[in-house]
């Protein structure tokens, strides 16, 4: 796997000195207990108690420090007492890290027989957080609000999912995509504004001639090749015959060459295209699948937006059950409508139901030798299918909630990995909505991530998001698209 960096989240509690020093000390004690309680759960990332904020200068200095700290992936704020929101304006205005407004309180229950005004003055989250929430709305800053008791399991799960989105946002600002060759000729949706992508999303996209990659492939040693083949033999079912073995060996050579090229340039995502293979013996298939399983992003036919999207979603998902995907063909059986997703070769084995098998079959596109690839059925379960498109003036993230199902029949003549799913709210409505929103045929499919996480990432990134789920109707979606168009046009003025 690509080595992940260490990230923490700062916990900052709002208060004021109006209630006296003892009250501030009590707020600090309670804040530390909440942090310890959050860290006792199943959070992927550590919550670090930072301070009780009681002044404008204190907030500003703290947020400036957070901006500079490379390990800080975001700030969690909570108002234990009333905290006048004017003191938060400079800090919030300068903050460039993800922000979670955690609306909770230290005590779960009202102490009916003991409650007095001292208790009321300390435990004012119910209206202290409303004051703080107003200034967030007034400033128009992107933020997440999670309400609930801090020991509640569902609340912790919501915080954990937001943390994953925040870390993906921070890390995705440094994604570098290597493009081998150009886009597939005459295809529209895989094009896009690379400058705007770097400005808006932080993604850097570089193009290379295929000869640069071929040089690395040809430099692979026989020893490293032999070691990788041994790994293949342990992980996958193997084809019979010497010709098939030679095809697999060539994919291993491509994998090693690709990985060395990407590692040396600091690239964590890449694209290929069957129209640019001069000097290569095969279109990368098994090699791409293996690299995706290690956390690399990939896009077919030069689709750099999807390559970066896959990398970002891989980071958000911790590398689990996430893959490059394409809507391929429909099953229109009444009452059982489904979509079969696949691609020519490149589906990540992280979504495989069983042990993948290596197969070698002809591929008409590319006019090269028969490429080896992993073939498997995808797992069943809830998932999201996500596409990123460039509308010329802005990016739009299109999200569809789906339910992947077990493939009901053998497909012995289909030589590629495949996934079968039922889109929400139905195939007919989801397809109409997807097409109206301009969603691409290339997507990233993830079983680990939720639509809410993708919406959170879009909010952090400042891009439009369209969600297609059980509540979607075409009339409402048409109106939403019109409102979004108007809103983004107004942003330019």
Swiss-Prot record:
Family: Belongs to the arabinose isomerase family.
Function, as annotated: Catalyzes the conversion of L-arabinose to L-ribulose.
Listed EC numbers: 5.3.1.4
Cysteine-cysteine disulfides: none
A GO molecular-function descriptor: L-arabinose isomerase activity
NCBIfam families: PRK02929.1
HAMAP family for the chain: Arabinose_Isome
Pfam families: AraA_central, AraA_N, Arabinose_Iso_C
Record's protein name: L-arabinose isomerase 1
Keyword Protein biosynthesis attributed: no
Taxonomic lineage of the native organism: Bacteria, Bacillati, Bacillota, Bacilli, Bacillales
GO terms of biological process kind: L-arabinose catabolic process to xylulose 5-phosphate
One GO cellular component term: cytosol
Pathway noted in the entry: Carbohydrate degradation; L-arabinose degradation via L-ribulose; D-xylulose 5-phosphate from L-arabinose (bacterial route): step 1/3
Catalytic activity line of the entry: beta-L-arabinopyranose = L-ribulose
Co-factor binding details: Binds 1 Mn(2+) ion per subunit.
